[in-house]
Amino acid sequence: MTNIRKSHPLMKIINNAFIDLPAPSNISSWWNFGSLLGICLILQILTGLFLAMHYTSDTTTAFSSVAHICRDVNYGWIIRYLHANGASMFFICLFIHVGRGLYYGSYMFLETWNIGVILLFTVMATAFMGYVLPWGQMSFWGATVITNLLSAIPYIGTDLVEWIWGGFSVDKATLTRFFAFHFILPFIITALAAVHLLFLHETGSNNPTGISSDMDKIPFHPYYTIKDILGALFMMLILLILVLFSPDLLGDPDNYTPANPLNTPPHIKPEWYFLFAYAILRSIPNKLGGVLALVASILILILMPMLHTSKQRSMMFRPLSQCLFWMLVADLITLTWIGGQPVEHPFIIIGQLASILYFLIILVLMPITSIIENNLLKW
């Protein structure tokens, strides 16, 4: 008799994706983050569902309903902080996952990579709309500033912004629709993640060497299931330390003040995971130019396969490219720091230089360095 997991139509899909999946024998812990993202997504959907049971998406009661969740709902505080800090863990895993893809040349799987970029955009949109929901000062002004950027689009800009707002300013209609979108998008993300996985399993996983591992595969279970569980335990440990010891570490104190359209906070800034893009936006004095740079900073990922000039896929044996990669990481950390600073000297010039360097490394230095490395190996 055939094993039910290999014959049952539904079990067969799960079996081929998570149990009998042939995986390279040498993938490192950098390959753990895909499964960690899946865990983050499940955690966010579950905590979000319980929060939605008590939250009200009305400008007069939204702030109070979040306070009510924290004070009166059984374990509401832990659900709220798991959700808020879970988003931070989600983005840490996302950035490492994308960084792994860049380092080891995983972007050569075109369909998987492009779906991944779409996923990144969708998760960023979801997180932005979620940040608006508590209706604190930073929620309101963050929503006003970021949506207002669309007015830079020629001809249709103003109409587009008013259409998104549902009025002439960020108000009740905006909050209600943001809640609706914030609720539905994670399910769209889940569907996209399934497609992401589908395309990945067409080719099989990449590995640190960047060369084919078809001759040396091992079953996903038990080898990588146990490895993923260890990674998940580490992540949950970090998340719980954050939630139980310093839940507001990554938040903004301004968001504990109810939204007031008549009082602008001194420094409007998004959550930490958007600061690098916010710094790039602010470093260009022109509104439309800034918006284009902001979009380009993420959209540039789609160009990665076209910018790959090396004869080797991975950076494992390319020390010059490795130096550039870590320069890029340092540059992104610098941009993140600048995004949280006020717009004054010397932060303006540091932000502008870091923004130029970001695009320079990806568009110019990396492709040229790859060609130099090819020539050094006389290829």
UniProtKB/Swiss-Prot annotation:
One of its GO terms (biological process) is mitochondrial electron transport, ubiquinol to cytochrome c. GO terms for cellular component: mitochondrial inner membrane; respiratory chain complex III. Its main location: mitochondrion. The keyword Transport applies. A ubiquinone binds at H201. Binds 2 heme b groups non-covalently. Keywords: Electron transport, Heme, Iron, Membrane, Metal-binding, Mitochondrion, Mitochondrion inner membrane, Respiratory chain, Transmembrane, Transmembrane helix, Transport, Ubiquinone. GO terms for molecular function: metal ion binding; ubiquinol-cytochrome-c reductase activity. It is found in: Mitochondrion inner membrane. The chain crosses the membrane at residues 33-53, 77-98, 113-133, 178-198, 226-246, 288-308, 320-340, 347-367. Heme b b562 binds at H83, H182. Its cofactor is heme b. Heme b b566 binds at H97, H196. Belongs to the cytochrome b family. Heme 1 (or BL or b562) is low-potential and absorbs at about 562 nm, and heme 2 (or BH or b566) is high-potential and absorbs at about 566 nm. This is Cytochrome b. It comes from Sus philippensis (Philippine warty pig).
